[in-house]
């Protein structure tokens, strides 16, 4: 059982994916609160917007790590979400800060539903990725 760079990448990905799972859960709860009018859109967008860039950077860091470790299957599984993150960030509303959510448009029913679906899809992806990274870490540690 040897400790390789690929094993380190999977271990770090496990820890950071747990963080991304909490981000996705926070995202889902925040949009549910908006849907049920528990919180106003300005406050909610002010708490959600600072989480966007760290989430995207953590995921991009995964992709760079797995590229350097030559874990091609793992990189291939992460590329669609990375491409979506890049597209989503490039097509964000024009604002003064680096966020995605505009308080003036977030309460539109279609945008709110889209953001909720996005949160659930990301939660599913991060949960599946967490268990895949766990499997990959064990496989790399045992096989080398």
Curated annotation (Swiss-Prot):
Cellular localisation: Endoplasmic reticulum membrane; Golgi apparatus membrane
Transmembrane segments: 11-31, 57-77, 123-143
Entry's family note: Belongs to the cornichon family.
Broad class of the protein's primary localization: endoplasmic reticulum
Listed PANTHER family: CORNICHON-RELATED (PTHR12290)
Topology, Lumenal side: 32-56, 144
SMART domains recorded: Cornichon
Keyword set includes GTP-binding: no
Protein name: Protein cornichon homolog 1
Complex and partners: Interacts with AREG immature precursor and with immature TGFA, i.e. with a prosegment and lacking full N-glycosylation, but not with the fully N-glycosylated form. In the Golgi apparatus, may form a complex with GORASP55 and transmembrane TGFA.
Task performed by this protein: Involved in the selective transport and maturation of TGF-alpha family proteins.
Topology term for the membrane: Multi-pass membrane protein
Chain ranges on the Cytoplasmic side, renumbered to this chain: 1-10, 78-122
GO biological process terms, semicolon-separated: vesicle-mediated transport
Keyword annotations from UniProtKB, A to Z: Endoplasmic reticulum, ER-Golgi transport, Golgi apparatus, Membrane, Transmembrane, Transmembrane helix, Transport
Keyword Transport: yes
């Amino acid at each position: 059982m040897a400790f390789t760079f690929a094993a380190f990448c999977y271990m770090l990905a496990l820890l950071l994916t747990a963080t991304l799972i909490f981000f996705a859960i926070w995202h889902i709860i925040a949009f549910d609160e908006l849907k049920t009018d528990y919180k106003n859109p300005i406050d909610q967008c002010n708490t959600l917007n600072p989480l966007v860039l760290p989430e995207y950077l953590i995921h991009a860091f995964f992709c760079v790590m797995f590229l350097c470790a030559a874990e091609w299957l793992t990189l291939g599984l992460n590329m669609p979400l990375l491409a979506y993150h890049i597209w989503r960030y490039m097509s964000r509303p024009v604002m003064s800060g680096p966020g995605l959510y505009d308080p003036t448009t977030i309460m539109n029913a279609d945008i709110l539903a889209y953001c909720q679906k996005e949160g659930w899809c990301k939660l599913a992806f991060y949960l599946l990725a967490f268990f895949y990274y766990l499997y990959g870490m064990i496989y790399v540690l045992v096989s080398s």
